[in-house]
């Protein structure tokens, strides 16, 4: 039987790749080459951190950052902060970054997702000679463990919030037949 967590990760990455390809098609100029022959290869970590049994004793970062490839990052919420251990994805392209999901914890003090994403954007821009990367914040689906830190991005400059309702999502992506 396939591993459901691995399947969910692969499904989320596939959705993200589709969404970012759609988002990048809206960008008129490109300086990086992103061939569209399929998903770019990358590597998963040997093991995800799990946090400590007690959040008081935890020494692991609140957000584990894994570089899947040059333009794709997989983030994981520390399970000592929230038992869900939510996964989030950041995809980079010409002038645009796409954040899929925002985890299970809203508090920036406990779960500084925006700070981590801002640092990733800054580092990626420096490495690839990009500036003013626009961030799109979207969700794979609307369970609370996927959008709790949404509030951290609402006032972020140069950011588009796709929305949390079915209508907002379908209007933004242009879906006409979406479940």
What is the predicted role of each segment?
Residues 108-179:
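Active-site HxH/HxHxD metal-binding segment of metal-dependent hydrolases
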Residues 63-123:
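Conserved beta-strand hairpin/beta-sheet module of binuclear metal-dependent hydrolase folds
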Residues 12-23:
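Hydrophobic membrane-insertion alpha-helices, especially the h-region
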Residues 26-60:
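N-terminal low-complexity, Pro/Thr/Ser-rich intrinsically disordered segments
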Residues 47-58, 73-82, 172-178:
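Short, solvent-exposed secondary-structure boundary motifs
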Residues 2-14:
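N-terminal Sec-pathway targeting helices
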